[in-house]
A protein has these predicted regions:
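Residue-level detector of Asp-centered blade-edge/turn motifs that repeat once per structural unit
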Residues: 101-104, 169-170, 242-243, 356-358, ...
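Conserved blade-ending motifs and adjacent loop-strand segments that build the rim/top face
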Residues: 405-417, 448-470
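C-terminal segment of N-terminal export signals and the immediately downstream linker at the start
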Residues: 5, 24-67
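N-terminal secretory signal peptides and thylakoid transit peptides that target proteins
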Residues: 1-17
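Beta-propeller domains
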Residues: 297-398
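Loop/turn-rich, solvent-exposed surfaces of beta-rich toroidal or solenoidal domains
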Residues: 366, 408-448
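Blade-level signature of beta-propeller repeat domains, shared across WD40, Kelch, NHL, RCC1
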Residues: 468-498
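Beta-propeller blade signature
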Residues: 136-145, 197-215, 262-265, 387-396, ...
Length: 498
């Protein structure tokens, strides 16, 4: 089997990796500032795992992934294959997901489907239980053995749209996020091509957070209720503070600056086993040194890794706006953020994946770290930011925000998206969403990068998404989005830094 690495796919960057993860960074205690002397810092021996090699899929023998030697995987839940528990084909565009312990040693996965384009038959699954029969997104639930050699599957939410990332709750639910506010009052999506109809005929407002119980079994689909007080914007990911039930949320407005939000439910979700509507939405603002109030700052550029800010949480008075006739897609997407920005809310580039660990929220800015950018970018097509990615950390107890990593170039880290913390406290796993050679990569507690998995399907163009560890931390689950494949990956974790 031929060995392969990231450096075989992309030209090495001459930039310098600077990574600072101080003693406040949860599982990364003891990490000190690093400045490379001659170039990027990659973990020795690829994080202890050695080079990546082509590995056959235990499902059918096809070599879909490159992994460190000794690791195995099985694919399942593939797009357009029949769901086992109902007469529906598996939807595509697999994205964020979470894995929960279930009965008889099995696990349940609740998985997003980031489908957005008009669907000739509307929502997948039972239209009678769809939130919006015209909307093609939602979630499926899969019940599997830990290594996916036995699978059952069904629809657990339908009639939503652009279900991107999300997050697991401590009380056994999946929070799924709609990444567009297009709806009955703003039909024209930026995703619609020139040959598509002007009207998508949405019947409901969109751009919300929804909650899906992992206990929802086959035949138990219900019409979903959005948590409208958690905001109507381009939701990306969610993470829950188990101590308070507060929900932290990222926004990915692609061509414009985005915000980092907190929703404070009016109930105790850990007691009610659900998040109630009617709470308070807030946006994060940073307080510069010497100041006493938050000041609107651009955090996508000119930020040194290791920089820490005090923060303030700014109330959003109109979390669920109605869009006036004639409002453009871009204008509609920015309504909630612009209220927060006008009050001192921080400006980030494309906030995407997020994970809670040990009192800290780690979240990703996909195109942060570049030169200062404008709203929208001058070329009109690239995302706001122009960088290769940042990793931020919010300390809940100390109410501080720290830039813990910034990629200097595509050979180091290229457009990170979803993120998950290793249960062994050694690293975070990052899903790349770039144009070629996409990988699962690890950022260690010493600020070093190494490769863990390389896509060998469709010439590596397809992005990884939804990476998350199962109960016990021995199996890593991840999706290949456009091809619509889910993987269960396991092997000798103790050999290296994951």
């Amino acid at each position: 089997m031929a060995a392969i690495s990231r450096r075989d796919f992309l030209q090495k960057s001459a930039a310098v990796v600077v990574a600072t993860l101080g003693s406040t960074v949860g599982p990364f205690v003891g990490l000190s500032a690093r400045a490379a002397n001659a170039g990027p810092k990659f973990a020795a021996q690829n994080g202890g795992y050695g080079p990546l090699v082509a590995v056959r899929d235990l499902r059918d023998g096809v070599e879909r992934l490159f992994l460190p030697e000794g690791f195995q995987y099985r694919s399942f839940g593939v797009r357009n294959t029949p769901l086992t528990e109902e007469a529906t084909l598996t939807p595509g565009r697999h994205d964020g997901m979470a894995v929960f312990s279930w009965k008889q040693g099995k696990v349940r996965i609740v998985r997003n489907h980031e489908q957005t384009q008009p669907n000739p038959v509307g929502a997948f699954g039972d239209l009678g239980h769809a939130y919006d029969p015209a909307a093609p997104g939602g979630t499926t639930t899969l019940e599997i053995s830990p290594t996916a050699d036995a699978v059952s599957s069904w629809v657990s939410l339908n009639g939503t749209t652009f279900n991107c990332a999300g997050g697991a709750s401590p009380w056994g639910t999946w929070l799924t996020c709609e990444e567009t506010p297009n709806g009955v009052d703003q039909q024209r999506s930026f995703l619609i091509g020139p040959n598509d109809p002007d009207d998508l005929t949405y019947t409901q407002k969109h751009g919300y957070l929804f909650e899906v119980p992992v206990s929802r079994g086959p035949g138990e689909l219900e019409v979903a209720d959005p948590i409208v007080a958690a905001g109507r914007f381009a939701h990306e990911a969610a993470a829950v503070d188990p101590g308070t039930g507060d929900v932290y949320m990222t926004e990915d407005d692609f061509a414009y600056a985005s915000g980092f939000y907190r929703y404070r439910p009016p109930n105790r979700p850990d007691e009610d086993k659900r998040i109630a509507d009617g709470g308070a939405l807030q946006i994060l603002g940073v307080i510069p040194p010497g100041a006493s109030e938050p000041v609107t700052m651009d955090l996508h550029a000119d930020q040194a890794p290791g920089t820490t800010y005090r923060v303030a949480w700014i109330p959003i008075e109109v979390p669920d706006p109605e869009f006036a006739p004639g409002l453009s897609n871009d204008e509609a997407a920015r309504v909630v953020f612009q209220e927060g920005e006008s009050k001192g809310g921080a400006r980030f580039s494309r906030l995407e994946g997020m994970d809670y660990f040990d009192g800290k929220i780690f979240f990703v800015s996909t195109e942060g770290g570049g030169p200062f950018d404008s709203d929208p970018p001058p070329n009109g097509s690239a995302g706001f930011g122009g960088g290769y990615g940042q990793v931020w950390m919010y300390d809940i107890t100390n109410e501080t925000l720290t830039l813990v990593f910034e990629s200097p170039g595509p050979d180091v880290l290229d457009f990170p998206d979803n993120i998950t913390v290793s249960p062994r406290r050694k690293s975070v796993i990052l899903c790349e969403d770039s144009s070629a050679g996409n990988m699962l990569r690890a950022l260690t507690r010493d600020g070093l990068i190494f490769d863990f998995a390389l896509n060998n399907v469709a010439s590596g163009v397809d992005e990884f998404s939804g990476a998350t560890f199962g109960p016990g931390g021995q199996v890593l689950y991840a999706n290949m989005q456009a091809n619509g494949i889910t993987y269960a990956i396991w092997g000798p974790w103790s050999n290296g830094l994951i």
